[in-house]
Every structure is written in C-alpha cells, then in structure tokens.
Amino acid sequence: MQVIVVYDVPAKRTRIYRKLLRRRLEHLQYSVFFGELTAGQVTAMKNEIESELEPTDSIVVFEFDNPHAFDHTTFGDADEPGSRFT
C-alpha cells in the first residue's frame, strides 16, 4: 500500500520522527514522507510512532490500498514522489 506521513512536532523532536520514518519511507519535504509498504510494515511503523508520541506531537498517516485512488500535482523544484531513495 502507498503511505504518506506528515508530522507537526516541536523542533527539538523532529530528529526523532525523521530518523524513524526514513527507515521505511522517502523524505519528500521537511515533514512529509512517502512510500510503498506492506500492511505489516505500516503496523510496525505506527507502533514505533506511538512509542515515541508525546502530547505536543501531531502525526498523520494516510494509507492507500489502490495507488490510482488518489492523484497529486507537484509544483516548483521538487522530485516526483517515489523517484528517489532517501
């Protein structure tokens, strides 16, 4: 399944989530990650996120079983999602 994760956390905690998410996903922009994962990998990632979560953290995980179920448009100087490794 395709996964998009975005986070909004205090600056001192961004390193925690960036490191955690880069293990499985492509780092698209500052707090945006994208990739193709199995259901088991998504569950493991969510468990890791939950173990690091503090009350001031906000993380959203979008999951798409059908890659054609959503569309995207990229503006400016940005790589297409899925076009590079992290």
Swiss-Prot record:
It is an enzyme of class 3 (hydrolase). GO terms for molecular function: metal ion binding; RNA endonuclease activity. Its EC number is 3.1.-.-. Keywords: Antiviral defense, Endonuclease, Hydrolase, Magnesium, Metal-binding, Nuclease, Plasmid. Mg(2+) binds at D8. InterPro entries: CRISPR_associated_Cas2, Virulence_VapD/CRISPR_Cas2. GO terms for biological process: defense response to virus; maintenance of CRISPR repeat elements. Disruption phenotype: Loss of the 8 Cas genes in this locus (cas1, cas2, cas3, cas4, cas5, cas6, cas7 and cas8b) leads to loss of CRISPR interference against plasmid targeted by this CRISPR locus, i.e. plasmid is not destroyed by CRISPR. Its cofactor is Mg(2+). It comes from the Archaea. SUPFAM superfamilies: TTP0101/SSO1404-like. The keyword Repressor does not apply. CRISPR (clustered regularly interspaced short palindromic repeat), is an adaptive immune system that provides protection against mobile genetic elements (viruses, transposable elements and conjugative plasmids). CRISPR clusters contain sequences complementary to antecedent mobile elements and target invading nucleic acids. CRISPR clusters are transcribed and processed into CRISPR RNA (crRNA). Functions as a ssRNA-specific endoribonuclease. Involved in the integration of spacer DNA into the CRISPR cassette. Plasmid targeted by CRISPR locus P1 transform wild-type cells very poorly. Homodimer, forms a heterotetramer with a Cas1 homodimer. Belongs to the CRISPR-associated endoribonuclease Cas2 protein family. There are 3 CRISPR RNA loci in this organism and a single cas gene locus. A CRISPR-Cas type I-B system. This is CRISPR-associated endoribonuclease Cas2. It comes from Haloferax volcanii (strain ATCC 29605 / DSM 3757 / JCM 8879 / NBRC 14742 / NCIMB 2012 / VKM B-1768 / DS2).
